[in-house]
Regions:
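Long, highly charged, low-complexity intrinsically disordered interaction regions
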Residues: 1-13, 25, 230, 240
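OB-fold nucleic-acid-binding modules
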Residues: 38-68
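Upstream accessory/linker segments immediately N-terminal to the RecA-like ATPase cores of bacterial MutS
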Residues: 74-264, 668
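Inter-lobe coupling/hinge segments of SF2-like helicase ATPases
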Residues: 275-278, 289-608, 671
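Accessory helical-bundle/CTD segments and flexible terminal tails appended to RecA-like ATPase motors
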Residues: 513, 532-542, 549-556, 561-564, ...
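Conserved pre-motif I regulatory segment
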Residues: 21-22, 248-294
Length: 698
């Protein structure tokens, strides 16, 4: 990379130390390179001029050409006067509005001079208005040369200091004019085959495209490059791991697995479960460590697949463990596994933080001798005193709850690293899985066991609570249980969110004949355990909770999930909460309660929830609505996102294309030392040193 790109931004004419400090703090811009990579978030075509007579209030940004007729200053009773400029283009009159800077505006934009005005038209008292429009002297500017105007994101602090998108645009334009030609950062054969523009052309066109076509060409080139280096790094890392870590060869299927399959399997495996078991078997016979991500919606049978995987380890003379993020989840996994294995001579034990004294000592001793074959627990399994005789398989449930360093400790529990099976009930779209879990092989259970009744999801408004309470009462009288979820534990001053404490009291009055439990994030673990245990044992009929119940709780008798203020939740959260019901044979319901003031995006979320139970469809929609950074678990996944221009949700085809090209490079140069690829490996080193966080995954 040219050394000029490493130049401190303070040396760009017009910036200096003070502006540099603000740009660094607010936008992370410290160098010329940072400014070049601060890409526009949108563009507006400035080559067209509208007449005022053509306008309507539904138009987005438009451009006018005309003269200021006069100014009016209006006293609003506040410190700054409102400034109104009456603007005419010969086809009509519009008002230009400024809430501050009146003296500067009147001095800069003079009556009778012709200007280009650019902004969003609104209507007030039958007249079009433009608030804080962009203004350019029409005599000094050729409209035909303006093309697509870039718009840059700003923080509130920058706006308060008087910065606008145009401020960033001017700095970028100044930098681009002094830049020498930028060197290529992709191999010529990739650039030619994919018909990409050069890096130099892309960087210049992304900030100043003359047309929509130029903008698209620049975006495709820069997005592809960004995704290509992410994929190249992931695939190289995965290849290194496979070469470095041998795996136990488990090619024996014997009495334990066969006995379970023949006599203890509760139902015929679904086609998806059989397919996943074949994939796992192939991994365990390959001689390399298995690193597999098992995705499956709630109730798809992941735990059964995980158990059968552990039984293969037992058949080959090894132990297995399963880790869950909470004690409640660990206890439920233990119960499920013991139910499956009832009547089989297999010792299963639980190890969590609450197992103390002689019982703990006994478990640790029997683990070291191999007497315990399957250990279920929390992160307590990772503690130093926990030593396995021969750990062959480790199953990790809800993987994002375990940090990279924690998972690495598993490898010290055994001579060779154990086979790793990561389970998640949070469906991960394919493009996202390729990026954040790129070094894990992915298996998907996309089929529910037969006989499961799909959950019915209904949308109700908060004015319909009386009839909703009657429906809840009917369900409880049929012997069912109900979850009622509130979004927050305490009301904030700026929000009208229901307070769980007040809501709990209201519900007690509404249902005096029933018993209620209550759990929220501010309670101590022991208190939550007691309240949850009462609900699990059917001692209480209604559980009032915040989202702390969204992962792992298994109460087959609960058939109704009511989510209050559902407009406050993301799609992924709503789907996870819905997954707490529908675990028994009864028809289950999820009721989404909202107010009437719903944004278009919220309506889309509610409609998707009512339309489908398919977690993968919901995850794809969530990714498109919110972007990858908000998806639960991605920030803890181990591959932190630092994408400047690519969008995993919308650029799925480019993700796949980048992965294919990166895979071909690694296939042809597995040692990463071929002279023709020197450019790639040097560029990757540069990226690792600068702004991209390449943490390992599993």
């Amino acid at each position: 990379m040219n050394s000029i790109l490493d130049q401190d931004i303070m040396f760009l004419p017009g910036v200096g130390p003070k502006k540099k400090e603000i740009l660094s703090k607010e936008l992370g811009i410290n160098s010329y390179s940072d400014l070049l990579e601060y890409y526009p978030y949108k563009y507006v075509d400035r080559s067209k001029v509208f007449h005022i007579s053509e306008l309507n209030a539904d138009m987005p940004f438009v451009q006018l050409k005309g003269k200021i007729l006069s100014y009016d200053e209006i006293d609003t009773g506040k410190r700054n006067k409102l400034l109104v400029a009456h603007f005419s283009d010969g086809y009509g009159v519009a008002d230009l509005i400024w809430y501050r800077g009146a003296q500067y505006i009147m001095k800069t934009y003079r009556v009778g001079t012709e200007y280009l005005v650019f902004g969003k038209p609104t209507v007030f008292n039958g007249r079009f208005q433009f608030t804080h429009p962009d203004m350019d002297d029409a005599t000094n500017l050729q409209i035909s040369e303006m093309g697509m105007q870039p718009y840059y994101s700003l923080t509130e602090n920058l706006r308060k200091r008087g910065y606008t998108s145009r401020s960033i645009e001017k700095m970028t334009k100044q930098l681009v004019t002094i830049l020498p030609p930028l060197p290529e950062t992709l191999p010529s054969h990739i650039v030619d085959r994919l018909h990409l523009v050069s890096r130099d052309a892309a960087v210049r066109m992304i900030h100043y495209p003359h047309s929509h076509q130029e903008m698209q060409k620049a975006q495709v080139r820069l997005k592809f490059e960004e995704l290509f280096y992410v994929q190249l790094n992931i695939i190289r890392y995965a290849t290194d791991q496979r070469r470095k870590f041998r795996g136990y060869v488990f090619n024996r299927i014997a009495d334990i697995f066969n006995g379970f399959y023949a006599h203890h399997l509760p139902f015929e495996l679904t086609g998806a479960q059989k397919r996943v078991m074949h994939e796992i078997r192939a991994d365990m016979c390959s001689g390399r460590q298995m690193n597999r991500l098992l995705q499956g919606d709630v109730g798809s049978g992941k735990t059964l697949v995980a158990l059968m995987t552990m039984l293969i380890a037992l058949d080959n003379g090894y132990q297995a463990c399963m880790m869950a993020p909470t004690e409640i989840l660990a206890e439920q996994h233990l119960q499920t596994i013991c139910d499956f294995l009832q009547g089989m001579d297999i010792r299963v034990e639980l190890l969590t933080g609450i197992v103390k004294g002689k019982k703990r000592e006994k478990i640790l001793a029997d683990l070291a001798t191999g007497d315990i074959q399957i250990l279920v627990g929390t992160h307590a399994i990772l503690e130093d005193p926990v030593v396995f005789r021969r750990l062959g398989v480790a199953v990790i449930d809800e993987q994002h709850r375990f940090g990279v360093a924690q998972r690495a400790k598993l490898w010290n529990k055994s001579e060779n690293p154990p086979h790793i099976l990561v389970m998640t009930a949070t469906p991960i779209p394919r493009t996202l899985a390729m990026t954040i879990y790129g070094d894990l092989d992915v298996s998907v259970i996309d089929e529910l066991p037969p006989g499961r009744k799909p959950i019915q999801t209904l949308h109700k408004f908060d004015t319909q609570l009386t009839s909703l309470y009657q429906s809840i009462r009917r369900q409880i009288n049929l012997g069912r249980q109900v979850y009622i979820v509130f979004p927050l534990i305490k009301e904030s001053e700026k929000s009208d969110l229901k307070n769980l404490e007040e809501g709990y009291e209201t519900l007690k009055q509404a249902f005096p004949e029933f018993k209620l439990s209550k759990i929220h994030g501010k309670m101590k673990s022991a208190e939550k355990e007691v309240e949850m245990e009462q609900f699990v044992k059917d001692e209480t009929q209604i559980l009032v909770a915040t989202t702390v119940i969204e992962v792992g709780v298994n109460v087959p008798n609960a058939s109704v999930m009511v989510i209050l203020d559902a407009q406050r939740f993301g799609l992924s959260q709503l789907h996870q909460l819905r997954g707490r019901v529908g675990r028994g044979s009864d028809q289950s319901y999820c009721i989404l309660v909202t107010n009437y003031k719903l944004s278009e995006e919220t309506r889309k979320r509610i409609d998707i929830m009512c339309d489908t139970n398919d977690g993968f469809r919901i995850a794809e929609a969530d990714l498109k609505l919110r972007g990858p950074g908000d998806l639960e678990g991605t920030q803890q996944s181990g591959m932190a996102f630092d994408l400047k221009i690519a969008n995993i949700a919308r650029d799925g085809q480019l993700v796949q294309l980048a992965r294919n090209e990166a895979q071909e490079i690694i296939d042809n140069d597995p040692q990463c030392n071929a002279p023709q690829n020197a450019l790639l490996w040097n560029r990757l080193k540069e990226l690792k040193k600068t702004h991209i966080n390449w943490a390992a995954i599993s």
